[in-house]
Amino acid sequence: MFDIGFSELLLVFVIGLIVLGPQRLPVAVKTVAGWIRALRSLATTVQNELTQELKLQEFQDSLKKVEKASLENLTPELKASMDELRQAAESMKRTYSANDPEQASDEAHTIHNPVVKGNETQHEGVTPAAAETQASAPEQKPEPVKANVPESTETASVATIDAEKKSAAPVVESSPSSSDKP
């Protein structure tokens, strides 16, 4: 793979022994061996994936060839009906794009919201209704509060309100009910 001979490998080992020493050299060799193992597995994985992709591409190409061959071997009736469908589709495209090609392409890429439209198109032919009578509110100004009100009038009105509340209190009747029975 790297085209390294035995003599080069022995030279690297001796230099490593001199630089790292006898205690750290085995740890360094294990670490380098782990890196090499990881690189080899990565290369193998990439190679397998490329092979699978190439096989898939070849399969798709052969499938397209078979489809073309089957289309060429169709009966004349099926070919005629396919040609008619193609002509109808192209005529529809031409009539649609003949109106305004630029507008047709803009319309194809536009999302329409039926709720938000112009008032002219939404209310075409509709006239607003006229009201027979128009309501109006009377113009009133608030009356000024009188500051010179005697206190006796104020207390009398409060006493009247208290008396009305007491007379409006509900009357409770004491009658035996079913819950009072033993």
From Swiss-Prot:
The Tat system comprises two distinct complexes: a TatABC complex, containing multiple copies of TatA, TatB and TatC subunits, and a separate TatA complex, containing only TatA subunits. Substrates initially bind to the TatABC complex, which probably triggers association of the separate TatA complex to form the active translocon. Residues 168-182 have a biased composition (Low complexity). GO terms for biological process: protein transport by the Tat complex. Belongs to the TatB family. It is a single-pass membrane protein. Gene3D superfamilies: 1.20.5.3310. The chain crosses the membrane at residues 1-21. It is found in: Cell inner membrane. Keywords: Cell inner membrane, Cell membrane, Membrane, Protein transport, Translocation, Transmembrane, Transmembrane helix, Transport. This is Sec-independent protein translocase protein TatB. NCBIfam families: tatB. Its main location: membrane. InterPro entries: TatB. Residues 87-107, 121-182 are annotated as: Disordered. It comes from Salmonella typhimurium (strain LT2 / SGSC1412 / ATCC 700720). HAMAP family: TatB. GO terms for molecular function: protein transmembrane transporter activity. GO terms for cellular component: TAT protein transport complex. Part of the twin-arginine translocation (Tat) system that transports large folded proteins containing a characteristic twin-arginine motif in their signal peptide across membranes. Together with TatC, TatB is part of a receptor directly interacting with Tat signal peptides. TatB may form an oligomeric binding site that transiently accommodates folded Tat precursor proteins before their translocation. The gene is tatB.
